[in-house]
């Protein structure tokens, strides 16, 4: 319930503030002031990941990746699906991270938390979780910023207001210019968390990390505050909430006029024929 989640958030925030090596993160700011990053065109990459390899992904994920690629091509972007066979082509990940992944001290989801910020730091571009459905009309320019995400604060309903993000961002859709300060600081934060905790303080470590940086560093606070509002909690999760409903063309058109990016889930216990989930899997949306 809301009260216990708020209390839990408070305890985790206190733990993170007390244990994070802030001087390591401050070094990123010193490096940043010494590095003149040339402002060029926004990097045209859409990054995502399926660790076991795309060919081994569930059907739904293969379909969402199909839509991500289609969207990327329309906008002149290259899609890169990171997996265990190609990661070394793009990143040098510290050995202790792999060792913790093998031991199971961190799972693939939290490993991918680190990977998205390393990619944005090194190359820039857009990160989308592999279960994201992107409608062709999604306004990509809201992500072509120094650092961006989906700010979904305009939702009037009170659900999930106990969430640490306070609707300022979503971890499954992030973007940034190459070398952006938020990704660099988050990379430093996550490496510190992975190295110095037997178990990460929370599954949603990205949200606690961004919240921590927001509180501690004015520069990051200002960047996050400048992310334009787009969509609502209800709309972003609409496809997941309605996955078993029978597809209705008028309803879908109404929904995609309001919002054009959706979090879906491949974890459906059964597929209802002609449902939204079924349409997504069959690439008929």
Where are these regions (language model features)?
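Small-residue hinge/turn detector
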Residues: 113-123
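Glycosyltransferase-associated regions of secretory-pathway enzymes
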Residues: 1-112, 132-285
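Active-site acidic Asp-centered loop
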Residues: 123, 128-130
């Amino acid at each position: 319930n809301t009260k216990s989640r708020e209390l839990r958030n408070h305890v985790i925030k206190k733990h993170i503030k007390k244990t994070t090596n802030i001087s390591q993160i401050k070094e990123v700011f010193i490096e940043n002031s010494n590095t003149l990053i040339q402002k060029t065109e926004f990097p045209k990459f859409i990054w995502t990941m399926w660790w076991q390899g795309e060919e081994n992904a569930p059907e739904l994920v293969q379909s969402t990746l199909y839509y991500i690629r289609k969207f990327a091509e329309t906008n002149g972007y290259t899609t890169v699906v990171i997996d265990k066979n190609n990661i070394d082509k793009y990143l040098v990940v510290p050995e202790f991270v792999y060792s913790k992944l093998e031991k199971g001290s961190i799972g693939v989801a939290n490993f991918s938390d680190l990977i998205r910020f390393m990619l944005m730091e090194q190359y820039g571009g857009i990160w989308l979780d592999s279960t994201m459905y992107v409608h062709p009309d999604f306004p990509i320019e809201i992500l072509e910023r120094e650092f961006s995400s989906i700010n979904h604060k305009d939702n009037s309903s009170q659900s999930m207001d106990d969430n640490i993000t306070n609707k300022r961002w979503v971890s499954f859709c992030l973007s940034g210019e190459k070398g952006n300060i938020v990704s660099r600081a988050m990379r430093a934060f996550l490496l510190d968390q992975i190295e110095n905790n037997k178990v990460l303080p929370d599954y949603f470590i990205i949200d606690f990390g961004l919240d921590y940086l927001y509180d501690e560093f004015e520069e990051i606070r200002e960047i996050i505050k400048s992310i334009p509002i787009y969509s609502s909690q209800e709309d972003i999760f609409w496809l997941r909430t309605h996955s078993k409903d029978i597809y209705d063309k008028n309803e879908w058109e109404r929904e995609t006029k309001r919002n054009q990016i959706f979090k879906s889930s491949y974890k459906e216990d059964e597929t209802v024929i002609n449902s939204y989930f079924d349409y997504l899997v069959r690439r008929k949306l």
